[in-house]
Amino acid sequence: MSRKIYIYDTTLRDGAQGEGISFSSADKIRIAERLDNFGVHYIEGGWPGSNPKDMEFFTEAAKRKFKSAKVAAFGSTRRANTKCKDDPQIDMLVKANTPVVTLVGKTWSLHVREVIRTTPEENVAMIGDSVRFFKEHGKEVVYDAEHFFDGYKDDPRYALATLQAAQDSGADIVVLCDTNGGTMPGEVSRITAEVVTQMKCAVGIHTHNDSGVGVANALAAIEAGAVQVQGTINGYGERTGNCNMTSVIPCLVLKMGYDCISKENVARLRDLSMFVDDLANVRHDIRQPFVGATAFAHKGGIHVNAIEKVARSYEHIEPETVGNHRRVLVSELSGRSNILMKAHELGMDLSKDTPEVRDILQQLKQLENAGYEYEAADASFHILVQKLLRKHKPFFKPLTYYVTAAGLWHGMTPGLGSSSSSSSSSDENRIEATVDIEVGGQNVHTKEAGDGPVNALDKALRAALLNFYPAIANVQLIDYKVRILDGASGTAAKTRVIIESTDGTDTWGTVGVDANIIEASWEALVDSVEYKLFQDEKRK
């Protein structure tokens, strides 16, 4: 029977300490509930007393019954030369009313002498007293040995003495922390194995990614005998982040065979990763192992030809086992297999014998040479293929468009100082777009104002189509990227625009290229609307 490994998630505390990461108390509750449903064993909610949000979280968490997870409150050992009952921080941990208390204490003599400035003996007493205090209050106690690996390399006898103090006072588990993230996997493996042989209580691991080996260090510690791994979803955390749970969990379950999270739940890993990113308002890392959009994306023609025959020839696991899916990219590097698999992915019926496949491949290479890129523009690729197969049925015909801008001068007039104007502020920087299209046998003319030329064009085009295709009202432009393709040409440089759109259910990308950024944007907008209408027609 495989060894049981416990997942201790600290996204809500250590993860929230990452730059640009902030959760409301409501966000924390939603994430905690999602982690519990996923099967996480421990959820560290925060540091009681450090901020109002954390106490709000603990108050709300106490009202809920979690299925698989125990909620932990995080805090420090008592202050030097202070009794636990007189330490306000200790009191806040009691008031958090959690079944688990996680105490962090000093292990490295450098920190004892130079940071908290007490004696080695008093530090050991601080650890023992604090653990004992919470055990007497009926708590499960996790002891986090801060900077353990640095402390052990500097003075192994003292580092072990701090662990011994926690164990002898009743700690349920001692967790070895690579707080600075500078220890290598070989060192972690050796030191963890040495600690495991000398401790009677369980041993855990907490790593950081400063050297890029946070996940490797966690796995090395598990193989050396640790039974709990601490980390964060998507690797959020101080500096370069903590051990990434979205990498550790599938490694433990799918590759190493540990009893950890059920395979059924691991198949929802990507959804969990995306959910946490959404609440943190962080753009998803497409290159993240296992759960990133490119984790199972194939571009080279040889690769695609191989996976078409045997998927595992270029995939280390089945994408679906972590809730991901295979993607085939089309580019100037594509071969016939790329085109066929991408067409199949987009619901188009192509075979190796389809004579137009060669034409599609040739046209694709020419367009990419001209600056087009279809990796993030599947919808434009779909329309391109339909046109080359002579199956494209346009839903409308663009005729003309105009964009006008009216603004006030707010600069300096030579010899006259700062300029001024009596015009109303509502007229400043006014952008209007006029669109003429042919739709349903009619010529339609619309004019709309917007926050910029692309926004104005988008609004005008949709206004022109709305009476004919009401579903257009649901379409929103959610991302807009511009890239200058030839910076040496200055203002005459060709521009590539990639637009991402959604109707609330599906999301799709389109591309446009032109020396005129507005024309490039218009091309991408037209493709976006065409694709939406095509998909709606197909569903009927």
Which functions belong to the PLM regions below?
Residues 213-229, 236-251, 294-318, 494-498:
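Flexible glycine/proline-rich, aromatic-decorated loop/lid segments
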